[in-house]
Amino acid sequence: MRILLTNDDGIHAPGMAVLERIARALSDDITIVAPNSERSGAGRSLTLTRPLRLRQLGEKRFAVAGTPTDAVMMALARVMKDAPPELILSGVNRGANLGEDVSYSGTVSAAMEGALAGIPSIALSQVYAREGAGLNVSFAAAEAWGAKVLRPLLDAPWAPRSLYNVNFPAREPEQVLGIRVVPQGLRDYGQTEILQRTDPRGFDYYWIKLAGMPSTPAHSTDLEAAADGWVTVTPLHCDMTNHAALAATTALYR
């Protein structure tokens, strides 16, 4: 099985090394095409105003000076054009991609690009505790549980334009409770702040401070399940149509 690996933390990120070890438990045919630097929060953005640079770093290892979506496009249209991947894995992200995170996440967006191309695609992220913030995030749960959560998905039928979002809890492997399939949760991002600072030359600059809190019923979504210590699996699809609203919206124009 040909597997493409990508991410949004950059090709040199620790999570990429973890993902490669997970993937090699499934196949020896691995190709890595990922951004050359961190592109967290890039969503599904494309690079359209400057050329993309592709650099080969080793056998089947390529860095793209672009976004995660750029990297997947480059892999499918150039690097792996003659032998397309049969599976795309994106991650392992340093930090959760839960609830509304998926809308901003370059990790999930890279998997979504694969899904749009008709290729089974899975995003993987490692949640970390607040005290674990920084560069020393433990990927132990992802490494121990990665292949376990992937194998059943590979044997299952895939709906068109669908993908899976997997999050590993901030627990030691032996403390993980198991695997739960849960829907996407909801955070209250109305609490987001814009922090103002002033540089030495007197010019203002700003930081986005994400301060949202979970606001979904307990134990029913990816947010609560991951916090409780479960590996979460959430099926996603690329069709963003609100099908429940179609009839009511149609009636507005009669």
UniProtKB/Swiss-Prot annotation:
Provide this UniProt record's keywords sorted from A to Z.
Answer: Cytoplasm, Hydrolase, Metal-binding, Nucleotide-binding
What EC numbers are recorded for this enzyme?
3.1.3.5
GO cellular component assignments: cytoplasm
Which InterPro entries does its entry note? SurE, SurE-like_Pase/nucleotidase, SurE-like_sf
The family assignment reads: Belongs to the SurE nucleotidase family.
- Stated name of the protein: 5'-nucleotidase SurE
Q: Which reaction does it catalyse?
A: a ribonucleoside 5'-phosphate + H2O = a ribonucleoside + phosphate
Q: Does the keyword Metal-binding apply?
A: yes
* Cofactor(s) the protein needs: a divalent metal cation
